Amino acid sequence: MVRIRLQRMGSKFNPFYKIVVADARAPRDGRFIEALGYYNPQQKFAKVNLEKTYRWLHIGAQVTQTVRNIFSKKGVFKNFLEQKSSRA
């Protein structure tokens, strides 16, 4: 199973996260398939490559709860559902 999840980066007490597509069995900071963006929790800032994200969602990648919260704040799911309904 493929998941869209966070990969911790940064130093101690100064974390930031890459939003990545990875196999569910891979370790948190281990191997990943593709990077989709990043998230800085201290500044509450996230940057997401929408084209890559929509492609992985269309393929059927599962999204973790934390990434789901980030995506909903950015409006990713709303736009994805609009795109999906316009294709049909």
Swiss-Prot record:
GO cellular component: cytoplasm; small ribosomal subunit
Keywords: Ribonucleoprotein, Ribosomal protein
SUPFAM superfamilies xref list: Ribosomal protein S16 (SSF54565)
Signal peptide location: none
Record-linked InterPro entries: Ribosomal_bS16 (IPR000307), Ribosomal_bS16_dom_sf (IPR023803)
GO BP: translation
Matches recorded under Pfam families: Ribosomal_S16 (PF00886)
GO molecular function, one term: structural constituent of ribosome
Transmembrane segments: none
HAMAP family: Ribosomal_bS16
Family as reported in the entry's similarity comment: Belongs to the bacterial ribosomal protein bS16 family.
Protein name (record): Small ribosomal subunit protein bS16
Encoding gene (name): rpsP
